Every structure is written in C-alpha cells, then in structure tokens.
Regions:
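N-terminal subdomain of nucleotide-sugar transferases
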Residues: 1-29, 64, 217
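Conserved catalytic-core segment of nucleotide-activated headgroup transferases in glycan assembly
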Residues: 6-13, 157-238, 248, 252-253, ...
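Membrane-proximal helix-turn-helix segments that form the acceptor-binding/catalytic region
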Residues: 12, 55-59, 85, 109-131
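Active-site proximal beta-strand in glycosyltransferases
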Residues: 68, 84-103
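Acidic donor-binding loop of glycosyltransferase active sites
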Residues: 126, 245, 260-274, 287
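Carbohydrate-associated surface elements
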Residues: 134, 153-156
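Short hydrophobic beta-strand element within catalytic cores of glycosyltransferases
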Residues: 278-281, 288-293
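A charged, aromatic-enriched C-terminal amphipathic alpha-helix characteristic of glycosyltransferases
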Residues: 328-356
C-alpha cells in the first residue's frame, strides 16, 4: 500500500542525516542497508496493546542512547508517551492521515474514540509531522496544537525529474503488446488495493458512472486498465467488463511501467483522507491526472502545471468530459520535483528534528 511504501522511502532518504534504528514487525523482512532494523513487534493485530513493548523499547533506548522517538500514525501513542516520560526522549508523531476522520468517512462508529486518542497523542509530541497543509491546519485548530510544533512533511517521489519521452513510449509499447491495446487508443489507469473501501468505491464509480459516459463518446478511443490486488471475488476479475473497454491487470510486479505508459491516471476517490500517493507517483512519471477534489488534497495546483485537472466531487459527467479532452502532451513542471522529491522532504524533517 502507498502508506507502507511512503514510510520505507521516507526512512531511506532520512537515514543519511541521522543515526537511525527502526523497530518493526517480525514479518518485515525487507533488506535495508541505510539503517539498523530490529524486528521486535509481533505480527498479531493485538501488538498495539502489548504492554511488554514498553520494557523492550525502554531497554533498547537506553542501550543505544536514543534521544528522539518517531512513531508512524497515532496507534502507538500510549507507548510513545510512556517512553517520553520514562526515557526522556523527544517524541515525534508522523501522521499520514487524520485517522479518525478517515474512519469516519468509512462509516466506523468508533471514530470519535480514536479522535480523542489521536488528539492526546499529538498533544504530547515535541513535533508533529502532517502529510499535507490541510491536516496541519486541522491539528492546530481542532487538536489545539501549537503551530510551531506542526509541520507539513508530505509523501514524496524518488526521482528528481520525469522519465524521457522514449521511456514513456517504450512503456506504452509494452502495455499495448501485453494487453492487446491499439497504439492509437488512450490508456487510462487506476490502481490501488482493491479491498480498501475508498478504492473499491472508486472502482465502482469507474465501472458504473465514468466508463458508460466515456463509451458514449464516439470519437474517444480508450482502454481503462485496473491494477491492484485483493479484488473481492464478487467482481469475478471484471470479466463482465472485458467487452466494455476495461482491462483487469491485477497485481503487477512493477507499477512504474504503468504510470510511465498510461496517458491518463483517473482518480475518482471521494473519501479515505490523507494524500493520495498514487497521484504523486502518476504526476512524477509525467502521466496526466484527472481527479476529484477530495482525491487531490495535498497536491498543490500551483506546481502541477496543466498535468492535473481537478473536478468537483460526484460530477461524473464533467469528469468524463475532462478525460476525453485531457492534454497528455504538456510535461510536469520542475516545481513539482522541488516540492515532492524525497531528498528535499527528508532534509526538512531531519533539520526540524536536529533543531529540537
């Protein structure tokens, strides 16, 4: 998922600036050369309430003379607060969403309980990193956080420039050959973990709203490629849509090929919170984006040039019109990489932490 990838890339670029030890789950077998990884946490869903971790992490902190503790998301807030009190470390909360609002948008009854816990966690932090400016403002206004303790540390992109025209053409040629797409057809892409409700809702919108509108446009030739795992069995691998310009690619080994080869990335997501990491990646690979307003939160329009069109939520007719009229020639401007390059983001984060 995008959030997990974002955490891994953040620390990859962050590690050269600090002496970093990462505490993670036992099933996280990723080989990392930039920093030390300790597989301390259980894979069980009950790991978030395991009190023994206080004693284990307290020992590690003292042995390694750790001075700062970063927690990803608020769920280990209780543990971070205890370690802050007993080990005198400076607590940093790295938020990827306002989690309570994300679960509220998904209809979870307990979102209010999480809201108060999330607030408590952030209020005990020496620094709060939010994924975009709207979340930062929310933290200041609703959680009553001090503005000088709140900063935007966004999701990033690994490269400092877009792929060449030749790279994009090669990727499109690969996709056309693999999925029998005519070279003259526009390739529309959507990807995500498909049992995650916001992504599943977006898929339903593509199938039931957007695609029928595009099919009605006689002069627009296209294929929609859906990438992602965990598609519920009820969808029958989208076989019923095979004759309706829909291609289900499933899980793909290298999604970057699809970002490079697609003409347009469509993002009809209307809930879920946070920054849509797939948009950052699509734009970074110079793919034109058509998105709902909710789906484009955290992507400043001032740095995307003509590569991203933002449509009002639920206006699917206008969404389809913009897809058909999309400019796929103009490139993503350099300002995008100034803002979203992981190296710049990590430098900002490390400077803030080192200045505590």
């Amino acid at each position: 998922m995008g959030g997990q990838k974002g955490i891994a890339l953040f620390y990859q670029f962050f590690a050269p600036h600090v002496n970093l030890t990462c505490i993670t789950t036992k099933n996280n077998a990723a080989a990392v050369k930039e920093y030390e990884v300790l597989n301390v946490l259980s894979d069980s869903k009950f790991r978030y309430v395991n009190l023994s971790y206080f004693f284990k992490l307290k020992k590690i902190i003292r042995q390694k003379k750790i001075t700062h503790l970063i927690i990803e998301h608020p769920y280990y807030g209780w543990l971070g607060i205890l370690l802050k009190w007993f080990c005198k470390v400076k607590l940093v909360v790295h938020s990827h969403n306002i989690e309570a609002l994300r679960f509220k948008s998904m209809g979870k009854w307990w979102w209010g309980i999480l809201w108060h816990y999330e607030k408590l966690t952030h209020r005990n932090a020496a620094l709060n990193f939010f994924i975009h400016d709207d979340d930062r403002e929310f933290g200041i206004k609703k959680f009553k956080l001090a503005p000088d303790k709140c900063f935007t540390i966004t999701y990033g992109f690994e490269l400092t420039n877009a792929p060449t025209t030749e790279e994009r053409q090669s990727a499109k040629h690969f996709i056309c050959n693999k999925y029998l797409v005519d070279a003259a057809e526009k390739i529309l892409l959507f990807n995500g973990t498909l049992d995650y409700k916001p992504n599943q809702d977006a898929l339903d919108i593509i199938l039931e709203k957007i695609n029928p509108l595009l099919q009605a446009k006689e002069d627009f030739n296209y294929k929609i490629i859906i990438c992602g795992n965990k598609l519920p069995a009820a969808y029958n691998n989208l076989n019923n849509y095979a004759t309706k310009n829909i291609i289900y690619a499933g899980f793909v080994d290298d999604i970057t090929v699809f970002f490079k080869g697609a003409d347009i990335f469509i993002n009809p997501v209307i809930d879920g919170g946070g920054i849509k990491t797939k948009l950052v990646e699509a734009l970074g690979y110079d793919c034109t984006v058509i998105s709902t307003k909710s789906g484009a939160i955290g992507i400043p329009a001032t740095i995307t040039g003509n590569k991203m069109k933002v449509i009002a939520d639920m206006d699917w007719e206008e969404f389809a019109n913009e897809v058909a009229l999309a400019n796929t020639v103009t490139g993503i401007p350099p300002a995008f990489f100034d803002h979203f390059y992981w190296g710049n983001i990590a430098t900002k984060a490390s400077t803030l932490i080192n200045n505590l």
